[in-house]
Structures are given as structure tokens and as C-alpha cells.
């Protein structure tokens, strides 16, 4: 099965399934002599892992990462870095009732049609559990970006359902309280929105339903010049990486779809000797980073694994009514914050290495 790798010079390949023995990844291209241990990776995995909040799935996984290769005497060697996380809390019996049926809104049908076989246990390879290894690789990329270039990649939850954060609390990036973002269960920068999110998730769990979400990712201190026009534009690669995350249905760079109602006189980011006057473009012009903060917004669909009965068909194309059992997130966007950060960091590091190779 192709499509398991991302990047050219900094390349990440993941493997493993939701209910398999383990998840893993191979990282190629990280420069040598960077100090690295499991302790550098684990904090981001802890932000993503299940079973740590009443707002997310009840599946409990330690998500303890182990470095298998590419590190000697506490430093990267420049060779392939192998990482692995063992699965411990699989409950495959929850999925026996769907082994011959297709869950509406899931990848069951398309995987079966494409490959003629599928791992029905928790979605197999299509499960969001696969993203644990992206987060692990992204933590390494974030460390290198921060130490070598001062680049910070951070994200926050901006909306669940119809409930949005107060836009004034993020209008000035420099004033975002990132400590608060990382210390509340919703990764939300707006303290007034947290209790509203709490009430919404409680209601969804009682109803057995789910809701979509919107996240914002911000990369600061990105140098000018990253991006390879025309087909490897930085914004194109970021969109590709973010769209590859499970349940993501839309990506916006900068003002995104709001540009439709803007005039050119409003949208253009005017320049002065002291810098740009605005950042409607989201830090990317002509597919190349402008030196401004890179801003992306991503939309997550509501998960289809819900207790509300739905119509579907079985392997024999017979009509059925299905209720999805198991342990699932009422809003997958909550745990997606470190995943989004990871994908942006992976793309930025790849483009930084490509920039250095081409332009010195």
C-alpha cells in the first residue's frame, strides 16, 4: 500500500494499525549531532494520547515511544531514526459486529473496494491512531526547528460546532497565552469558551452523537524563501500535509475562504520599510514564505462512530441499520492540536533543508 511517506529531504514513513501489535515510523534526513531522547518526544504524545480526558475516547494507551535507531550517545547520527509505540488497550471484540458491514462515513467501504480486504478492528490503517507516529516525528522536527532556527509551531482549538472562541483573544499572536492553551483540556486560548465547550461535549456524549471542529496552526519566525514553485509551493505542501490528517475536510491558509468577499485594496498585504501592514496571505506569497507568521486553519468533520442508528449495507449489499459500538471521541478535533503542529513542522523542516541545499 503506497502513500505512507511524506517529505523529500526530511522524510517520514509511518506503519501500523489501530489494533495491531505496534505503531512505528522511520525518519530519514534529520541532520546529525542533535541531542535527542524519548523525553523530547513524549510530551507531545501525551497531549495526543487517548484516555486522558473525559472529553475524548476512553481507550487508554500509554503511547510510550521507544527510539530503535539513529541515536548514539544521546545524539542523532544522521542515519534513519526508527521509532515504535506498542498498542496495549485494544478491544477488538467491540468491532466484531461490523466485520461484514460498512460504517457510514468511514473508510470501510473504500478500503474494501480498493484492496478487497480490510482490517475492521478500529479502522485498521485508516484509524486516527496512526497519527501517534506523526506526532512523534513532528516532535523531533519541532525540536530541530526551534533549536536551529528559533521557529515555533503551535496550534489551538478555535471552534466546536457553532461555538467559537472570541477572536479578540487571538488577534495579536504575541498576546496568545500558550501556557493556558496547553493546560486546558480543549487546547483553547479563550477561557470564556472552555465551559461552553465542556457543556457541549457533555450533551453530545449523552446523545451518543458527535460534532466537528476548527483548529488554527501558527508557525512563527519562519525565514523568507521556503517553498519550491510551482508544484511544491509551501502552501500547497502544507495543505497536502494537513489534509492527510484523518477527518480533515478543509484547509485555509491566511484568510482562506474569506478572501472571496474582500477587495484587492483590503486583501493585499501592504509593505513599509518597517515591514508588512497586515497578514491576509498567512505568511506565504507566490508559494514562498514571506517571513511573516504562517497561519493555517483546518476543519474536522464530526466522527461517524456514534451511537445514533444509521443506514448502511453489508458485504452482500443488503440494507442494515447500524449503531457503532466501541470507544470514540465525541469531537476528534480536540486531540488533533499536536497532530496539526506535527504536520506543519514536518513540512517546514523538509523545506528548510531543501532551501539550504538549493540556496545555501
UniProtKB/Swiss-Prot annotation:
Disulfide bonds: none
EC code(s) of this entry: 4.2.3.5
Quaternary structure annotation from Swiss-Prot or TrEMBL: Homotetramer.
Reaction(s) the record says it catalyses: 5-O-(1-carboxyvinyl)-3-phosphoshikimate = chorismate + phosphate
Cofactor annotation remark: Reduced FMN (FMNH(2)).
One Pfam entry name: Chorismate_synt
InterPro entries, per the entry: Chorismate_synth, Chorismate_synth_AroC_sf, Chorismate_synthase_CS
Biological role stated in the UniProt entry: This reaction introduces a second double bond into the aromatic ring system.
A GO term from the CC aspect: cytosol
Protein name per UniProt: Chorismate synthase
Cofactors demanded by this protein: FMNH2
A molecular function GO annotation: chorismate synthase activity
Keywords: Amino-acid biosynthesis, Aromatic amino acid biosynthesis, FAD, Flavoprotein, FMN, Lyase, NADP
Keyword GTP-binding assigned: no
Pathway in which the depicted protein is active: Metabolic intermediate biosynthesis; chorismate biosynthesis; chorismate from D-erythrose 4-phosphate and phosphoenolpyruvate: step 7/7
EC category: lyase
Residues binding FMN, per UniProt: 125-127, 246-247, 286, 301-305, 327
Species per Swiss-Prot/TrEMBL record: Haemophilus ducreyi (strain 35000HP / ATCC 700724)
